[in-house]
Amino acid sequence: MKNSRDVVVVKYGSSSVTDEHGMDAQRLSAYCDEVEQLRRRYAVAIVSSGAIATGKAMEPGRSLQTPDENFAAVGSAEAFIAWQKELRKKRIASGMVLVTNHEIESEEGGILRRRMLSMMNDRDDGIVPIANGNDVLSKEGAQELRIDTDNDRLAGHIAELLGAKHLVLLTDMPGVLNSDDEVIKHVGVYNVNQTLALARERQIREGGGGRGGMHSKVKVAYEASHAGLEPGFAHIAEATNDLQAVIACRVGTHFAPHA
């Protein structure tokens, strides 16, 4: 199945969608305004973190020794419903998609692709897939996603599966910063190693762990812009930015396609 419109995959990190009380409805509402505008031209798939943080907010009295998988079990439905509620206000239908490495890397990836494209091509104005790594059921696979790049890698894989025109990784930074704290506007073969080194140094200096830091975002974005038969653009930008401006390369850091 081929999508009738170009696909955009937008990934929101946990810090962009949650606060101390769980999913942040006010910010989600603003993001959904952006999604509504974007859908006038593109088919949109969302990758959203936040299940674990939401579970912890819902169960504040639980021991710190409680496994993250348990918090994800508590929070995953609530996180999706928060998105669904705000999208429904825009008369946009949405559906939850929980994914593991197995479904992406095995032949089942084709099934996942067809299912997501079927949702986006639904005759009644499409359904927006809201994907998340299945932290509850996946052991080795989902844990690998979390330790390495959180949902960044998942978003990159989904963008490749769907043949997306754009992959947008949204964060709390204006883009990838150089040593002078200026946004690096474009990353390609000529400067990717230097950009990776800068992102790694900053992540270590600021105490960032191994989950979804800027280094991993740069790696995922660069790989995504080189992946597939029809590589697409990848972008890293601040979640508060206008998505149209990000896709038009007016704000953030951008990775041009190169087969």
Name every feature range the model reports, one short phrase each:
Residues 1-259:
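C-terminal catalytic "cap/lid" subdomain
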